[in-house]
């Protein structure tokens, strides 16, 4: 509580509720801090990366997968956007398997399309490959996707549980 005394303020005392709150604050145990800051890179030897990044990072039981493009054996696959969608999902499955997870444990998917007219074809394959219940999802058209000059029309990334 504050009381005015002339031009000065005096602190009479702090309320009991404030004191009990202060006493309830304790330092976080060290093992919690260590567990929260642990992150493990995941890379499948069966897949190649298009840049300086990890294919996934595992942190606190959650797997954050980098975007996958339709590459198999180091080459962009030819075919429809449906074929490319299937390959992206197969690549994600490989990364998740390497991380000790699976497609069943995906909770969020982000899809990046070079052309939103491909939305229906992507949905057809997506529905066939991913098990129910389907994860939360965003699908957006972007100006370009990686390796678009080589025919890439889609990139898919996801977040999954361990």
From Swiss-Prot:
CDD domains: YjgF_YER057c_UK114_family (cd00448)
Subcellular location: Mitochondrion; Cytoplasm
Pfam families named among the record's database cross-references: Ribonuc_L-PSP
Record GO cellular component, one term: mitochondrion
Keywords, ordered alphabetically: Cytoplasm, Mitochondrion, Transit peptide
Signal peptide range: none
SUPFAM superfamilies: YjgF-like
Family of the protein in this entry: Belongs to the RutC family.
Name the UniProt record assigns to this protein: Protein mmf1, mitochondrial
Taxonomy of the source species: Eukaryota, Fungi, Dikarya, Ascomycota, Taphrinomycotina
Gene name of this polypeptide: mmf1
